[in-house]
Design a protein with these regions (language model features):
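Outer-membrane beta-barrel transmembrane domain signature of Gram-negative proteins
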Residues: 1, 5, 17, 29-145, ...
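Glycine-rich, histidine-containing beta strand-loop boundary motifs that form or position
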Residues: 13-15, 77, 150
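One face of beta-strands
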Residues: 15, 164-166
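Short, ordered loop/turn segments at secondary-structure junctions
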Residues: 16-20, 31-33, 151-155
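Transmembrane beta-strand segments that form the barrel wall of outer-membrane beta-barrel proteins
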Residues: 144-155, 161-162
């Protein structure tokens, strides 16, 4: 990130990216529906998540004679892109191999511990969100701190969200 001063404002801007991936390997099992030739280890698929975040924040203090401390004001904006991907496992981890049980019913398909994700389960989705916030905080008296904040966001997949916060803290030790 980068920090700088712009007039009375302490500014901060940053970009962050993160990703995680989880893949399932199933061991010491078999796909009973394949029969005796079934292997005992399967790559059963998995999923990944990634997030790219840009943000800009400004903070400043404003002296007000009616307050016991300067009023702290913070404003900011954030843009985010999130991605989720679910990927299929190898076919033997989920497929039906054709073996029938002695009672005439089909053997359950897929690895017995966890039948892998199928191609029909695959997804590769993304969404974006843009948000902004305002936070104001000050001591109303020497002992009483008040804070109020509001944050609005717009999500590409489900619309708008508005959240607020109101807090009071009394310091009994002063």
């Amino acid at each position: 990130g980068v920090s700088w001063i712009m007039g009375e404002w302490d500014m901060d801007a940053s970009i962050g990216y993160g990703k995680n991936k989880m893949a399932f390997t199933i061991e010491n099992t078999l796909n009973r529906s394949i029969g005796p030739s079934s292997k005992t280890e399967f790559e059963a698929g998995g999923f990944s998540y990634d997030q790219l975040v840009y943000n800009l924040t400004g903070v400043r203090s404003v002296d007000m004679a009616s307050m016991a401390s300067p009023v702290n004001v913070a404003v900011g904006a954030e843009a985010r892109r999130e991605g989720y991907k679910l990927f299929a496992g190898e076919p033997d981890s989920y497929r039906f191999g054709g073996v029938m049980l002695p009672n005439g019913l089909p053997a359950p398909p897929g690895a017995q511990v966890f039948p892998g994700f199928r191609p029909a389960n695959e997804s590769n989705t993304h969404r974006t969100a843009i948000g902004a916030f305002v936070d104001v905080e000050a001591n109303l008296t020497k002992e009483l701190l008040a804070s109020i904040a509001v944050r609005g966001e717009h999500y590409s997949d489900f619309g708008d969200s508005l959240a607020g916060k109101l807090a009071l803290r009394y310091d009994f030790s002063k």
